[in-house]
Amino acid sequence: MEAKLLVLFCTFAALKADTICIGYHANNSTDTVDTVLEKNVTVTHSVNLLENSHNGKLCSLNGIAPLQLGKCNVAGWLLGNLECDLLLTANSWSYIIETSNSENGTCYPGEFIDYEELREQLSSVSSFEKFEIFPKASSWPNHETTKGVTAACSYLGASSFYRNLLWMTKKGTSYPKLSKSYTNNKGKEVLVLWGVHHPPTTSEQQTLYQNVDAYVSVGSSKYNRRFTPEIAARPKVRGQAGKMNYYWTLLDQGDTITFEATGNLIAPWYAFALNKGSDSGIITSDAPVHNCDTKCQTPYGALNSSLPFQNVHPITIGECPKYVKSTKLRMATGLRNVPSIQSRGLFGAIAGFIEGGWTGMIDGWYGYHHQNEQGSGYAADQKSTQSAIDGITNKVNSVIEKMNTQFTAVGKEFNNLERRIENLNKKVDDGFLDVWTYNAELLVLLENERTLDFHDSNVRNLYEKVKSQLRNNAKEIGNGCFEFYHKCDDECMESVKNGTYDYPKYSEESKLNREEIDGVKLESMGVYQILAIYSTVASSLVLLVSLGAVSFWMCSNGSLQCRICI
C-alpha cells in the first residue's frame, strides 16, 4: 500500500513539473499558397502578386485625359470626316479610344494605304499641332477649290468634303500642271495626308480634270511615288462608282515635300506637327470615360495596382503589370497555418510545435510557452522573428522589383493582306505569354517552398538552442517541450529564452531529482513484480481448491466414481 501511494505521489509531482515549449504562431488566416510539392497550403501570412480587378472606367492617364473618338475612327478623325467635327480641336491625349461602332472613317469609298502603320505611329504620339500646310485661299489660284464636293460626304443635307483635304478640279476648261512644295520648319515630324481620285469613266475624268492622261507625283527625301488614275467601272459604294485612295507620309525637320499633278489630286489642306516620346496607344473599348485618374489603363477599366502581374487584359497603356494567364500567384511570407488542438489535462498542457501552432502567441512568428508555480504564458522570440521578417521582406521586394517591369502593351496593326503575318505574330505573342506565365508560376512555387522550409528550420534552430542550454537539467517530452528536473521560476525561464541560462546553478538539484525519479521507477517496478507473483500463486490455489470441491461433490452423489488403489 505504501508503494502504491509513493507511485501516485510521484506521478502527481511529475505533472507539476515546470516546463517550457518551443512553438510557432498560428492564426485564423485562410490564405492558401502552392508549392512545388503541395497545393493549397494554408499559411499565416501571404502576399498577392496578381492583380485581377479593375474599376470598369476609362480614366485620365497621369492627369492627361484620353481622346474619345466616339463614332469616328482614326481615319475619319485625321482626314476630317464631317461626322467627326467634335474632334476638330482635339490636339492632345494620353491615349486614343475607338468604340465597337467607330464606323465614321473615309466617307468617300476607297483604300487608306498603310493605315495600320499610321495607327502604329500614333502609339508614340501624345499631341500635335494642326496647321494649314497649303492655305486654301492662296495656294491654288489656277484651280477650283470649292466644287470638289460629294453626296457621300454630305453635311446638313448638302454635299461636302473632308475638313483637312481639298478636292481640286479644273478651273474653267483647263487644269494646268501644278507644283507646290512645303519645307518642314516645325522642329518635329510633320504628318502629311493626301489622296488620289480614280473616276469610273473617261467622261467623268474630263469633266473634273480635263486631262485624260493625268498623273500625280509626290516626292521628299524619303518618299517618292507617281500615281496615274485607274479609270474603270466599279460597283457603287455609298452612291459612288469612283474611288479615292488615301496616302500619308512623315516629313522630317528640314525636309521638303513637293506635290506635282495634272489632275486627280486630293491636296493636303491641314497637316500635323507631331509631339512624340510618350507611350500612347489606341484601344477599342465601350467602357465609359469618367473623371478619374490612373497609371494603367486597359480596355475593360483602369488598374490602380503596384503588383507585378495582372490577368485582366493583355492590352494595356501606361505603367502596367505584366499580363499572365495565371489565376493565382500568391507568395507565402508566414508559416504553415496549423492551429493546435489545445487538449487540456489537469494542468492545461499545451501542444507543442510538432502538433501545431499557437494562436495565443500574437507578437511574433516563433517563441515559447512556459509553465511553473508562478503561472504560464506565451512569449515571442523577437530576435529570430525579426531576422525572418527582414529576410522574407527583402526577398519579396526583390522578386517584385525584378518582375515588376511596367510598360505599355498595345495591339499590333495588320491589314487584310497581312493575315498570315498577323496569325504568326499571335502565335509568337502567345508563346511569349506562355513563357512569362510559366516563369511567374514556377518562381512563386519555388519561393513558397523555400519560405516554408525556412520557417521550419527557424523553429528547429530555436528548439536546438534551448536543448543545448538545458542539457540534462531537463528532459524532452516529445512535443516540442522540455520538463525541468529543477524548479524554474520566471527569472529562470527568461534566462532560457534570452540564452543566458546558468546550467551549473541548477545541475545539482537536477541531478538529485533525476536520481530520485529513477529510484522510484525501479522500486515501483519491484513492487509490481511481487504483486504479479502473488497474484499468480493465489489464482492457482483458488483453482485447485475449486476443482477439489467439485470432485468431492460428484463422488458423493454417484456422478463420479472414485477408486483408491493401494
UniProtKB/Swiss-Prot annotation:
Check the UniProt entry and state the signal peptide residues, or none. Answer: 1-17
Q: Carries keyword Membrane?
A: yes
Give an example GO molecular function.
host cell surface receptor binding
Q: Which regions face the Cytoplasmic side of the membrane?
A: 551-566
- Which domain of life does the protein's organism represent? Viruses
Q: Which Pfam families match?
A: Hemagglutinin
- The protein depicted here goes by the name Hemagglutinin
Look up and give the organism this protein is from.
Influenza A virus (strain A/Duck/Australia/749/1980 H1N1)
Upper lineage: Viruses, Riboviria, Orthornavirae, Negarnaviricota, Polyploviricotina
